[in-house]
Amino acid sequence: MKSTIKYLVLIIMCWVCGENLQAQPYMFRNVVMSDGLSGLLVNAIYKDSEGFIWLGTDNGLDRFDGVKVKHFEFRGVDSGRKKRVNCITETDNKQLWIGNGIGLWRLNRSGSELQRIVPEKIDCAVNALLADGDVLYIGTERGLFIQKDGQLLQIQTDKNMLAACNRIMDLCLNEDKSVLWLATVQGLFSYSLKDGQINSWHFRENVPEADYFRCLTRIGETLYLGTMSQGVVCFDIPKQTFAHTVSLGCDVISDIS
């Protein structure tokens, strides 16, 4: 693992050195509440197919067009915790989806209104959204939901809806899109999109805090998972084994990409 990381660092250094010959200066600008930002704590950032930057804060959803910020209200939601935006994504049909503290929302672009979707089924926090074409994978506090062809399917990793492993924090697909990987607060799970089979792996057996996976991403045949107490750990998909990566100086990882 260390040799792989050194190799990647070397590639990046070579690329940077080459680019410096024709490098253009980057311009940074901060967007603050005086610009219209609804809150200083930004939990999610997403760039849509039209080039808009969507910002999910503790107070709702904002859109930044490069000049100004427009705020979108969650109508009927008063509590700050319930307003908190956890995730944003867009399906191929240009539908923008938002997960917040109480459920799933969709933006009606024509009317610029946020509409709550299937509240009778998804009545809990939505922590992760993953779009694949027009299919939407929804990770919630009470399991996985899949919206496809107008149908909503619910999958639970445990029959007990309140089990910790049903708290899904992040999602990603494998390379051939046949398996969906779930980062939960109690282990790593896979869900076969072919036959519905569910498998699980634990970083450290009988050590619950070591299995609190906050986020994940995939590079080739390796998953990288951010934890709440163990830093970044990797999972070799073919070998089905965990390993530590190099120390980052902090063991609490809130996001990874």
Model feature map: region roles:
Residues 1-257:
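Carboxylate-rich, polar loop motifs that coordinate divalent cations or form catalytic acidic clusters
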